[in-house]
Amino acid sequence: MPSQEVSVNKVIVHPLVLLSVVDHFNRMGKIGNQKRVVGVLLGCWRSKGVLDVSNSFAVPFDEDDKDKSVWFLDHDYLENMYGMFKKVNARERVVGWYHTGPKLHQNDIAINELVRRYCPNSVLVIIDAKPKDLGLPTEAYISVEEVHDDGSPTSKTFEHVPSEIGAEEAEEVGVEHLLRDIKDTTVGSLSQKITNQLMGLKGLNAQLRDIKQYLQRVGDSKMPINHQIVYQLQDIFNLLPDITNDQFTGTMYVKTNDQMLVVYLASMVRSIIALHNLINNKLANRDAEEGKSDSKEAKEKNKDSKDKDNKETKDKDGKKAEEKADKGKDEGGKGSRK
């Protein structure tokens, strides 16, 4: 069952794994008081160190809330379940394990060492079943050897690995079908952009707080110094602009003025277009009203002409009837004389 050790550069988690973990968490929450659940991740390796996590299954797990060093994971159940999964899909192998965190725990290193019996390059994916903020609910880690500066023996620690959500075509169709009924149609592209920017700022704020806490703990000698982290922080600080430089301030003013000019011109164009539309609507309404009045006058003229024609026709018919009556009387008088 163990496979050759491969470096991990990125972890792709499929929606089926997220649904299975949430279902596992909800089921265990109803029957017990466990704060987190543990399971095994199945998947395969892609090219260039990309791990594709496509399936998972739950494993019986329990731990002491007071003493985190006391825990139990049923590895016999793990082996039996993996054997059955292997019969269904031989391509999927044990690639790591998961728990619902939401943070790293003290006994995660020991649990990871147990899972490494089945997968030497085991990956830990923390899946937050109850996320408080928007964003990805997954955090991936791999175990590495940490070398101490004081010459003490090396120790195991976790190193963060980039993770993302990926899906195949069939999974995308299923997820769209599930989200179709709960999709908010009132949310537009503008609100989505604002929400994404807001979540990005919240994430940046959280990362800055973590950096501050780490530096404070290192400064207070509560945590050992990690030179790799310090070098990365130094690179970040080197990328920050010097706001005290007059040239930088002037450049920012020029850029801000250019952006405000674009906004001003866009507002003027929108106002002019709205004014033209208003004028066009008024002209159209006026033409429509004039057309209605002209049609009414034409109808009245037609009605008067018809009435006049009818009256003239009736007068002519009346005259003809009178002439016939007079002619009949004359012929009757002549006959009586004879």
Swiss-Prot record:
Region entry Disordered, spans: 286-338
CDD domains: MPN_RPN7_8 (cd08062)
Record's keyword annotation contains Lipid metabolism: no
GO annotation (BP), single: proteasome-mediated ubiquitin-dependent protein catabolic process
Cellular-component GO terms for this entry: cytosol; dendrite; nucleoplasm; proteasome complex; proteasome regulatory particle; proteasome regulatory particle, lid subcomplex
Entry-linked Pfam families: JAB, MitMem_reg
Keywords: Proteasome
Record domain MPN: where: 11-147
Family per record: Belongs to the peptidase M67A family.
Function: Acts as a regulatory subunit of the 26S proteasome which is involved in the ATP-dependent degradation of ubiquitinated proteins.
PANTHER family, sorted: 26S PROTEASOME NON-ATPASE REGULATORY SUBUNIT 7, EUKARYOTIC TRANSLATION INITIATION FACTOR 3 SUBUNIT F-RELATED
Protein name per Swiss-Prot or TrEMBL: 26S proteasome non-ATPase regulatory subunit 7
Species this protein is from: Drosophila melanogaster (Fruit fly)
